[in-house]
Amino acid sequence: MGFPIALMIDYVWKSPKPPPGTKRRALDRTHPDNFKYFRNWGFTIYRTYYGPESDESWNTLLQVLTQQTRLALGYHDTDRLRAKDWRWANFYKGDKATYPDLINIMKRLFRLFPREDPDRLAGLDVAGIRKLCLEEGEQAESEKNMVGTRLKFVLVADEAVLKDIANDIFVVKTVGYDWDPIQDSRSWGWMRLATGDLLEFWEMILMADEYSISKYYDIFFKGSEEDLEKHVWWGSASLSRFGDCSRVQTACKDDKFGRFRFDP
């Protein structure tokens, strides 16, 4: 299953503090007038390759990541997951009408924050991105735009990524910039993932933060760092695979075990 939608809403909800000595008033989080109290969630994405014709691949990558992540949120819109969302059952009193609203709020709040600068970013490898993020205060800078910066992951579009996009191979690199090679020795601190799996990855690191476990556990890799350049993330052991919800597929009436169904 995925990370509960109602807990995601808690994560991005930042209601104003009441005046001293007064009790905080509960606000309807699904009311349009209160949308201003939500903060965006997403990733900073660094572009490190500026070769010929790479602009088109870069723009395609940004569009695909945004569209697929929002589509993947549709995985949560099922009776089964709603029934398991204890936070929704308690806080929203089991009001079924609110559940699709919460999913749509998460869709609207997703953002990518691109960083482009050929003079400073061109040719940087993973280690260079980590160094840049630490030296230039990536966490504090990103906090101005979105929640979740304490998760300390960014996306990277390097030469390999953008050339893959040009060949209809849709992957992106995700880099943890607080990775410790001794403490987190089971992984290299970065991973290539299919663009449709970005939501699953975000839910994985959010869950790790929520339960105080290593966010690098689910991106472990036994091979060399060179071999990792050919590997694509297989997903989290703690979550169901739902990246397929972001892909065009054909539903089959006779498929009893498929994810998609025809409406009656």
Spans of model-derived segments:
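Acidic, proline/glycine-rich low-complexity IDRs
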Residues: 176-264
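Extended, charge-biased low-complexity segments
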Residues: 1-194
